[in-house]
Amino acid sequence: MTKQELRQYAKTKRKEIVNKHEKDLQITKNVLNNPLVLKSKNILVYLSTPFEVDTFELISKLKNKNIYAPRIEKQEINFYKLDLNNLKMNKYHILEPLGTDKITNFQDTVILVPGLLFDQTGNRLGYGGGYYDKFLRNKSLFKIGVCYQELLIPRLEVEEHDIKMDMIITEEIWNLQD
């Protein structure tokens, strides 16, 4: 399948997920219990849309962490300190922070990355904009892909610009990559 066909397959599959809320809660629990998340100071987290793994429950439970969310600026994303009372909807119908406190020091930082599909070695199929791949290039932060178990497949074809995750967390597993 082409990347576009895989994206369509994943979008359809996401809509068919049974017990989504329970799976979201288990993924939240798995993220919160992850040793790297526990010891990190900064968490970069996407603001979920209806068919993605819900991050709002997770955000409400992340205590004593600096939480940042992405905002699209020109053709890239940057992460700004999250204030859930100060958000706007962007052209893709995704909530974004309006604040001005942008993270520039990525020491002690974990990023939770959305995707349509992930494979068992940490490869990710995104939405096609390349925003996360561009952002993650040349940054040393720990990358965690979050997805439902149904969207974790054995193998994805990747291109040179695709950035691999360090770990994948689903409702069933969290798996550190080699």
Which residues does each PLM region occupy?
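N-terminal active-site beta-alpha-beta segment that forms phosphate/nucleotide-binding
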Residues: 1-106
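Surface-exposed, charge/polar-rich loops and edge strands
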Residues: 1-5, 12, 64, 98-101, ...
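Short beta-strand segments
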Residues: 46-48, 113-114, 145-147
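Charged helix-capping and loop-helix junction motifs
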Residues: 126-131
